[in-house]
């Protein structure tokens, strides 16, 4: 079962041995909520290399690291130009994955997401492409800025930790800064930057190509990375529907 904590309309749930909870579902019917009904994310992903090779990555961290390292070495040998060729790391529904990039940057990829990245970054910049959600811990390098492209938005990173949510079905891209600093650029208007400070979230409207900034609870936004299920303003019946 799951233990639950409701704070200010936000629910945090963690898996621990507990008796079942009885909750009100749709139509006022009561139902028992068991741990087997809510599953944490598993470590699993598929790595599709730039040359079409498909590598399944699972819970074996040593095997995963070896596979990614071997791919990186091969990529360096094959690519003698400064034009990066991208690999695609994809997580399925219910899957999560952590990867360390060539520069030491760590990325935690949430479920149903894809990170496109090169084996070796260009000499003047580091750039990745995100679909879905990921938490970034970027290695500081003033000479090679780090960029994240996501659905019409470009984030320039100055050595920091932040979370980006950019699922296809979402009307907006959500960029939340945990520490450090980032600057957002909207596609087609690269001269205007929107800077974030820790604890603030930029909401980029995909349709309107406009953005605004608001304060958020970063524990809520990044709860998924710590194995927490976070639901805002929903009762348990709605969550299980």
Question: What are these regions, as identified by a protein language model?
Answer:
Residues 4, 8-241:
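A residue-level detector for the "anchor" residue at the start of short, highly conserved motifs
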């Amino acid at each position: 079962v799951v233990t639950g904590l409701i704070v200010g309309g936000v629910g945090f749930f963690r898996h621990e041995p507990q008796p079942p909870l009885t909750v009100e579902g749709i139509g006022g019917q009561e139902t028992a909520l068991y741990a087997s009904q809510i599953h944490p994310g598993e470590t699993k992903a598929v790595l599709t290399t730039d040359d079409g090779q498909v590598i399944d990555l699972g819970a074996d961290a040593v095997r995963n690291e070896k596979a990614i390292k071997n791919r990186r070495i091969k990529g360096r040998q094959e690519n003698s130009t400064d034009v990066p060729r991208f690999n695609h790391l994809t997580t399925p529904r219910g899957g999560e994955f952590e990867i360390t990039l060539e520069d030491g940057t760590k990325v935690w990829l949430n479920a149903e997401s894809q990170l496109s990245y090169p084996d070796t970054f260009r000499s003047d910049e580091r750039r990745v492409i995100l679909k879905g959600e990921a938490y970034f811990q970027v290695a500081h390098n003033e000479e090679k800025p780090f960029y994240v492209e996501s659905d019409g938005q470009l984030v320039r990173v100055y050595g920091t930790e932040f979370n980006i949510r950019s699922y296809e079905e979402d009307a907006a891209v959500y960029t939340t800064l945990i520490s450090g600093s980032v600057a957002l650029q909207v596609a087609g208007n690269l001269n205007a930057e929107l800077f974030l400070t820790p604890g603030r979230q930029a909401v980029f409207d995909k349709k309107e190509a406009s953005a605004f900034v608001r304060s958020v609870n970063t524990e809520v936004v990044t709860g998924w990375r710590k194995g927490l299920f976070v639901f805002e303003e929903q009762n348990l019946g709605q969550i299980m529907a």
